[in-house]
């Protein structure tokens, strides 16, 4: 019994000594921390706020960028065209995601030689919501249209991401190239808003397969948009790795040397119209056009007078320029409609 009491007393004293030594070490360590915070507390606080905001933005970036469920039921119901030739198509991407497409067929004169437009929509809704715009393209431009629902949108599977959208666009282009009933020498890309960034990426990687691109009310990059939308915080100083989605169109446009049409609505309240002008200026294309619509809003520029005329003139110019003599010429202009 006496031996057990002595052992317990020894252990108790040892634990007390260890606690006392640990507390002394804590006090010694605390001193430089107090001094550092006293001297640099403001800077440390700013850094903590900066890192916290960057972390929150990174985690919730997809929620801030992709809106596949707006308007409500967009994931459940996709309107289909009626009374016109069309196909409801499902294809698989290289990573196994099932995508839904709608092909609108032009059936008028010389339909076999009609251009095909691959249509990339914005960050909300589904392809069915773009049918009013697409049907007017079909009638006015005499083209085939393939409307694309990205992964996570409409009836397509998966979840949206930057890399995923790039894979989707590549899969759609590959699919178009397998269609013997579509003229592969007249493939046009059209992208509005987020779709413009997808179109620019696809064009930058496939210049040999794409005749021309047409982008409308799109942005330079997500970091540029973050600086615009969150101007109260110095977002421009955030490094690129803080952004889960980047969509660096201002860099990728340098690889798009095919004829390019930039469509800008000056009444766009979401994406600054100056970004469209900057993309136009950054474009190295020999044939490039900037069509400006003073009354054009972000989603409804296509309803402005002269919109389809601008697209029609551009498409005709591109088709005509297939001759090597025409392609050798460099031309650019700005049209205000």
Swiss-Prot record:
Active site: 193 (charge relay system), 268 (charge relay system), 298 (charge relay system)
Residue stretches spanning the membrane: 37-57
Presence of the UniProt keyword Glycoprotein in the record: yes
InterPro entries: AB_hydrolase_1 (IPR000073), AB_hydrolase_fold (IPR029058)
Main location (coarse class): membrane
Subcellular location: Membrane
Entry GO CC: membrane
Residue span(s) of domain AB hydrolase-1: 115-222
Topology versus the membrane: Single-pass type II membrane protein
EC number of this enzyme: 3.-.-.-
Carbohydrate attachment residues: 299
Record-linked Pfam families: Abhydrolase_1 (PF00561)
GO terms, molecular function: palmitoyl-(protein) hydrolase activity
SUPFAM superfamilies registered for this protein in UniProt: alpha/beta-Hydrolases (SSF53474)
UniProt keyword annotations, A-Z: Glycoprotein, Hydrolase, Membrane, Signal-anchor, Transmembrane, Transmembrane helix
Family, per entry: Belongs to the serine esterase family.
PANTHER family reported for this sequence: ALPHA/BETA HYDROLASE DOMAIN-CONTAINING PROTEIN, PROTEIN ABHD13
Protein name: Protein ABHD13
Protein source organism: Gallus gallus
